[in-house]
UniProtKB/Swiss-Prot annotation:
It comes from Parasynechococcus marenigrum (strain WH8102). Pathway: Purine metabolism; 7-cyano-7-deazaguanine biosynthesis. The keyword ATP-binding applies. HAMAP family: QueC. This is 7-cyano-7-deazaguanine synthase. GO terms for biological process: queuosine biosynthetic process. SUPFAM superfamilies: Adenine nucleotide alpha hydrolases-like. ATP binds at L10, S11, G12, G13, L14, D15, S16, A17, T18, A19, A20. Belongs to the QueC family. Keywords: ATP-binding, Ligase, Metal-binding, Nucleotide-binding, Queuosine biosynthesis, Zinc. Zn(2+) binds at C191, C199, C202, C205. The gene is queC. GO terms for molecular function: ATP binding; ligase activity, forming carbon-nitrogen bonds; zinc ion binding. It catalyses: 7-carboxy-7-deazaguanine + NH4(+) + ATP = 7-cyano-7-deazaguanine + ADP + phosphate + H2O + H(+). It is an enzyme of class 6 (ligase).
Length: 226
């Protein structure tokens, strides 16, 4: 039986690392794809490389896509403040990057088709889609339809599947799965700030730290909030 190939979008964060590890557990040959898009938390790319090495991915590519050229997000524009007051239900936060996931998924599908990969692995989850429009199930469902129409493989009936195994999961459940799969949590990076250590106060740090505490591992929390 031929081994299935998957392309995993690998940000360097906990969620994408866990999703990639899940694909590996299913026996996939996994190719990692990361993006240098001008994010202020550039440290996550070092984390992505470390995760790819630890998991033993077949390949790992890092592509430059300068979304900071026009800003529009707290993650790409230093003039926009990183929020620290918690996730507001029903509000799209300033850390949303215009078109980011649309660009990333499109490029991922290109690599997947070039490599003959059956799946594109995405780490989006319930925490993400509560705030970000391009992490929600309805977005992924429609993008899947587009992918099937926009590629040679899709038109021939064997297009790449957008696989988002964490889409209904809480952050705590993701942390627990990461431990089960021996994901190097200490090597991942979630902080939105551009420092060399996690700030402990941005929304991403708060969510990650809360999940780690719920999972019984406060020792892995950021220094500022442990």
């Amino acid at each position: 039986m031929t081994q299935r190939t998957s392309v995993a979008l690998l940000s360097g964060g906990l969620d994408s690392a866990t999703a990639a590890a899940m694909a590996l557990e299913e026996g996939d040959r996994v190719i990692g794809l990361s993006f240098d898009y001008g994010q202020r938390h550039h440290r996550e790319l070092e984390a992505a490389a470390a995760v790819a090495s630890h998991l033993g991915l077949a390949e790992h590519h890092c592509l430059a896509v300068d979304l900071a050229a026009w800003g529009g997000s707290a993650l790409t524009d230093d003039a926009v403040t990183i929020p620290t007051d918690g996730v507001q239900e029903g509000v799209i936060p300033p850390t949303y990057v215009p078109g980011r996931n649309t660009v990333f998924i499109a490029v991922g599908l290109s690599l997947a088709e070039a490599r003959g990969a059956e799946r594109l692995v995405l780490g989006v989850n319930a925490v993400d889609y509560s705030g970000y429009p391009d992490c929600r199930p309805d977005y992924l469902n429609v993008f899947q339809q587009l992918a099937n129409l926009a590629s040679k493989a899709g038109r021939e009936g064997h297009g790449t599947e957008l696989w988002a195994p964490l889409v209904e999961w809480s952050k705590t459940r993701i942390v627990e799965e990461a431990f089960r799969l021996n994901v190097p949590i200490q090597s991942t990076w979630s902080c939105y700030s551009g420092g060399t250590t996690p700030c402990g106060i941005c929304d991403s740090c708060r969510i990650r730290d809360a999940a780690l505490r719920e999972a019984g591992r406060p020792d892995l929390c950021s220094n500022a909030s442990a």
